[in-house]
C-alpha cells in the first residue's frame, strides 16, 4: 500500500516492428509513453523526427461516424427487452480486434446513413405537402380550376381581401365602378378572405382600383391544375403513400438496431487504435528505426523485458533522478479495502512521486467518520445494496468502480453506527408498532447511545477523534521529515505541539509538576516560542513570535473544532428522520405514516449522502492532508486496452 516505484524506459527498435510492438505494449498495459526529451543539437538525433500524418484524423472522423450511428439506432430501437440495466458483453481481445466486426459496423453505418437520408427526404416532402394543403384549404369553396387563365375579353383575378371587408361593401364598390364584373367568394382563413374576380378587360384597371381599398392582393397558382378539392385529394393520397414509406423506413431502422453491439465493439476497438496512433505521434522515427521513451512500474519491468526480447531492439530502464520526480507519473498500489479511496484522491490531487500514498492512512478515518455521520441501519443497508448492485450488475470501471466500493464500505460503517445508536429510519419501527398496537411496550431499539440524549458525549468523542486524526497526520509528517534528514523541523514543528499537549494532560492529572509548575507544559511553550523565531532576526523575532503564538494556537485548535461537524451531522440526520416520522404519525393511519415517513426519509437519505461525503472529504483534505500531504503528482496513464461498452475476458 504505497506509491509504486517507476523506471524510465527507453527503447530503440526497427520501424517495421513499431506497430506490432505498440499493440503488444497496449496488451500489457503497463507503459506510459511520453514525448522524448533529447537535445536537438546532438548530431546523432538529426535523423529522428516526430511524425504526424492524417491517419489519426481519419480514424477520429470514422469514430465520430460510428458514434453518431449508434446514437441514431438507440433513438430508433424498440424497448430494450434485456431490462433497464443490461450487462456488458464479455469478449476476448481477439474478438475485439476482429476485422469482421469492423466490416459489419461499416456496412451498418452505410445502411443507416442511407435510411436516415431517405427518412429526412420523406419528412421534408411531408412538410412541404402540409404547407401546400394549408395554402389550398381556403379555396375549397371555389369550384373553379386554379389554372383558369384570363382570355382576350375576360380578366381572371385570384386573390385575397382584408377580413374586415364586408361582401356587400365590396360588391357595391365594384358595381359603382363597372357592371362588367363579378366576385365569387371562396372562403376565409385568419384575417384574410379568398376571392375570385371576373371582369371585362376594359374594366380591369377600374376594378383593381376599387379592390385596392379593401386590401386586395393577387394570388398566383403556378403549377396547380384543377380545383382546390382535386389538388387536396392528390396531396392526401401522396401523404398516405409517404406515411407508409416512412413507417417502412423506421421499421428498417429498428431492424438495424440489432447491430448496436457490433457498433459498440467497433467503437471500443477504434478507441484502442486511436490510442496507439496518439502514442505513435510521441515517438521519434527515422527511415528504419524508432525511439520510444516512457515510464513503467518497476514491478512489471520483467514483463516488458520478456516482450522486448522477442524483437531486435535495444533498451534501458533507469531510476528517475530527484530533479525528475515532478515528471514521474504516480501509481497507487492499494488493496481491496483502500482502493475505493482513490475516488477521494482523484477529486483532490495526486500525491507527489516522493510523497506518501494517503489512501491506507485515510481509509479507517474516512469510512468511520462517514458511518458516524449517517448512523442509520436502513441507510446503511441501502448503500450496501446499491454498491453490490453496481458491482455485480453494471460492472463499472474507473471512478464508478471506486464509488461502488466506497458505498459498500461506508454502508457497512453506517449500518454498524446505526445499530449502536438504535436508528432504523430514525424511530420508524417503534412508531409503526405504536400505530398498529397502541399498548405495545416496544418503544425503542436497543442503543449504546443516542444523538438526542447523549449529544455532549458525542461532541466530546468527535473532538477526540479529530485530535487522534490530527496527531496521526503529525506523526506521518515527523516520519517523512526524519527520512528527508530535516529532523530539526520535525522537532520544532510537531515536537512542540506534542510537548504542549502532553504537558496539558499531565497538568490536568497533577503529574510532572516541579515546585507547583507544570514542567512539561512550560518546556512545550518555550519550544513554541523558540521554534517560531529561530529563523528570524532583529525586530522580525517579535513579529514572528506573535505570529507563531496566534497562528499556531488558533490553527491547531480550530482544526480540532472542525470535527464537531461529526456530531452536528449525526444529530441533524436523526432529528430530520424523527420529524418526518412524527408528521407521518399525525395522519393516524398506518398507510399514511408509511408513505410520509418513507418519502421524508428518502429525502433525508439523499441529502445526508451528499452532505456526509462533502464534510468527510473536507476533513480529510484540509485537516488531515494539511499535516503531511505533498501534492503535485500526475496519475499514471499507461497505454492499455480501455473499453466502454464491453468487458475483456481471458482467452480460453
Show the residue positions of the predicted features:
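Long, charged N-terminal accessory/stalk domains
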Residues: 1-362, 397-404
